[in-house]
Amino acid sequence: MEKIILVDEKDNEIGTGEKLDIHQKGKLHRAFSIFVFNSKGELLLQKRSESKYHTASLWTNTCCSHPRPNQDLEEEAKRRLMEEMGISCDLKEVFSFIYKANVGELIEYEFDHAFVGRFDGNPKPNKDEVEDWKWVNIDELEKDIDKNPEKYVPWLKIALEKYLNR
């Protein structure tokens, strides 16, 4: 079973737990979201695999995951970016935020660290993780999220607004 890090509202570690159990009980845990932009300022989105146990086949930011216990957060973000999207690039943490969202029968309650990177080219996504991908203009993405929120994971709108208003 995959263990993830439980935290308080200041991101202090308070323990670990099994990922599914934490999502079932809606406990606050550490996560990260990665936003990779190309030189045209477009954001790389991924469509989550239909096999994901929540928010399957929905569009999200470039990569989002949970760091493993006792590992460096930035290194974990780079590791997952390579595993999911086949991309290696420098990442910089730009902000963090807490959000809570119902996702089917589960609850995402995360202290989310947002990282930004730059990459030009095509990703080589892991088909077990990613159903599709695309580069998008931020203004067009904002409009589409407002028009078609059901196509996107709930945390994308929150994170995007925080990124644009930082």
Question: Where do the language-model regions lie?
Answer:
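Conserved Nudix-box catalytic region and its N-terminal flanking loop in Nudix hydrolases
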Residues: 21-32, 42-79, 83
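A short coil-to-beta-strand element that immediately follows conserved catalytic motifs
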Residues: 87-96
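Active-site beta-strand termini and strand-to-loop segments that position acidic
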Residues: 37-39, 117-118
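Nudix hydrolase/Nudix homology domain
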Residues: 18-20, 57, 69, 95-98, ...
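A structural signal for short, well-ordered beta-strand segments
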Residues: 34, 63, 93, 113-115
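Acidic, metal-coordinating catalytic segment for phosphate/diphosphate chemistry
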Residues: 1-33, 39
